């Protein structure tokens, strides 16, 4: 695992999948800034997505991790922020492609479609995959 990566993580509702993701990041010593149900601040999904996106935009975090029921809404909100490249990734292959080919910096997860048993693999793939510099010209 690559160390010294900071995450801002947010969800509007608690779920086992969100808890597994948080525990995985803590276990692997990734610093976290938490929003929404994770922080007990009662923010809705729109505000959670905005706060996580601002953290990444302002370099308070290297990556954002957003959860909502479909994952679509938080991803759309995140992509409204300059410099944010949010990708909805519900499996390892999509997470790898989003990082490699699109240099995505915010990971959206749909709670209705990701199995609890898959979340660690998605996060691991996201963290270990580096952007392919030859592809960056296509997204800038």
Residue ranges and their predicted role:
Residues 48-70:
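Short, structured active-site "lid" loops
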Residues 8-10, 14-17, 92-140:
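C-terminal binding/interaction regions
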Residues 1-2, 56-60, 99-101, 115:
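Solvent-exposed alpha-helices and their adjacent loops that cap or buttress functional pockets
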Residues 1-30, 138:
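Small-residue-rich anion-binding loops in enzyme active sites
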Residues 31-43:
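A short beta-strand-loop structural module common to alpha/beta enzyme folds
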Residues 6-7, 60-64, 83-85:
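Short active-site oxyanion
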Residues 66-67, 72-108, 112:
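Mid-chain, well-packed structural core segment of small domains
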């Amino acid at each position: 695992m690559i160390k010294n990566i900071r995450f801002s993580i947010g969800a509007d509702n608690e779920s086992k999948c969100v808890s597994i993701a948080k525990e995985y990041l803590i276990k692997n010593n990734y610093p976290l800034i938490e929003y929404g149900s994770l922080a007990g601040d009662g923010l809705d999904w729109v505000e959670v997505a905005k706060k996580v996106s601002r953290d990444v935009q302002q370099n308070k975090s290297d990556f954002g991790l957003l959860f909502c029921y479909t994952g679509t809404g938080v991803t759309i909100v995140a992509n409204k922020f300059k410099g944010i490249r949010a990708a909805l990734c519900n499996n390892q292959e999509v997470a790898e492609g989003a990082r490699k080919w699109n240099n995505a910096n915010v990971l959206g997860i749909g709670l209705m479609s990701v199995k609890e048993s898959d979340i660690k693999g998605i996060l691991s793939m996201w963290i270990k995959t580096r952007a392919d510099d030859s592809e960056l010209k296509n997204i800038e």
